[in-house]
């Protein structure tokens, strides 16, 4: 069985919405997009490169897929482990609304997402990585399918926005 590993950028108060840019996700009138950018340093970049180098396949929610698919297919892959991984590995996309995917290597998850992800985990191989995709991650956590949770915490408090661990989260350790 291969491990399912989640990587989330989060604030001190648990916000995971739109870390990369002001227009990344304005759902609910969120106006703080790009909050991670001032804190992204070479050390974090090197860590992200190392994590992406260990991926065999990706598992993405619809929103994260759409954000990634708008940016990464055009990115040069030479000397960029993140772009290389995103553009050459399979991307399994969990969505109830998408019917087709344009990004090379992207595949829709069919049927029940928990059963489909369990089947993906049951395969031999390297890491199945989830990046962002907070709604999907919440589903995976409830189903006890996450083997490792990597939280990259930025020293900022936003007070609003989508949180990975909101009201009604099942207590666990």
Residue ranges and their predicted role:
Residues 1-173:
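Enzymes that bind and transform nitrogen-containing heteroaromatic metabolites
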